[in-house]
Amino acid sequence: MRKLFLIPLVLLLLGLQSAVPPSVEIALLKYRGGGDWYANPTSLPNLIEFCNQNLNTNINPDNATVDAGDPQIFNYPFVHMTGHGNVVFDDQEARNLRNYLLAGGFLHIDDNYGLDVYIRPQMKKVLPELDFVELPYSHPIYHQKYEFPNGLPKIHEHDGKPAQGFGLFWEGRLLCFYSYETDLGDGWEDPEVHNDSPETRLKALKMGANLIQYVFSE
């Protein structure tokens, strides 16, 4: 008879667990200049779902959108940026991003193919004293829950260049990770968007989960 009482109790506890409000929120960066900051609308929701299921995170399933110059950016420990084209940060936006990053924030820039020539000079406005350096394959970001012994996975081929991961470091802390020639965000999108294979999408999601785990554990 006691077992019969335990069943409703277990169901109640499971219900309470599922009702726990999200403990953290991540954001997509909105910027000026004409580039498509909104390029991959299903990317972050899918990455969040994957992380909540596989890393036991409790991230709000609905990501926020934050302007580069908005002080609200300090509410988000992880900010994702993507696009194909032009990016412009004015002085106030560059200063806001700088303060955010130096205060402990993290920016993931994902080259959606074509972003490179625009984002590098703009990040120089944000952190003029820093240069992007390629992360070695031994860096912890490639060795979180999921192992990537050869660095970033190649999700979309484009012009055949190798995928590379670059970082900006401040006093030894990685505060910006730039995934180049890989298109991680495309791999996070709904399957029908790019018709990537399940294996390719899984590689992209696992690498994205590593980014989240690295940032949340630092």
Specify the residue positions occupied by each region the protein language model found.
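Aromatic-Pro/Gly-enriched surface loop or interdomain linker
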Residues: 18-78, 82-85, 175, 183-184, ...
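Sec-dependent N-terminal signal peptides
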Residues: 4-14
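An acidic, glycine-rich "communication" segment
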Residues: 25, 30-34, 42-43, 116-192, ...
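Alpha-helical scaffolding within the catalytic cores
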Residues: 61-68, 85, 90-95, 160-164
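Sec-exported extracytoplasmic/periplasmic mature domains
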Residues: 52-56, 102-105, 124-128, 216-217
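Short alpha-beta junction capping motif
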Residues: 26, 78-117
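Surface-exposed patches in mature extracellular/periplasmic domains of secreted proteins
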Residues: 57-67, 109-112, 130-138
